[in-house]
Amino acid sequence: MEIPDQFLVGATGPSVARVLIAKTSLDGHWRGINVVSRALREGGFEVILAGMITAETIARVAADEDVDLIGLNVGGRVEVVERILDTLQAQHVTAPVFAGGTIPHYAAERLEKRGVRCFPPGSSLEDIVTAARELTGHA
């Protein structure tokens, strides 16, 4: 799947980590995803801002674009994130995943057991960018 240039933001080049950012709910809240995308871009990442797409599309874009990291806006829908994780695994996509937004405590524990780094509301942008560097090996 070809990603239009207007959705590719940040630095580019072979040594730059690529991050796919997607929403998992129709909650209408875009501020968090936009702020995190900008922080990652300013932190030196190439960001593919995909918006609201299906689990299958997330897996396809992640594979086609050879992303180094996948970021998901949870919106309180942990079962959707788990479906995305299952789809990524089935499609052999091994990029690490981080999730932000409204994540109930019990859900964060479930996701973290599956290797997802969780960032609830109020997490600092510095912590998110630092974690992205650690997860991609671009520290």
Task: Specify the residue positions occupied by each region the protein language model found.
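Two-component system phosphotransfer/interaction surface
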Residues: 123-137
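ATP-dependent carboxylate/acyl-activation modules
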Residues: 1-48, 138-139
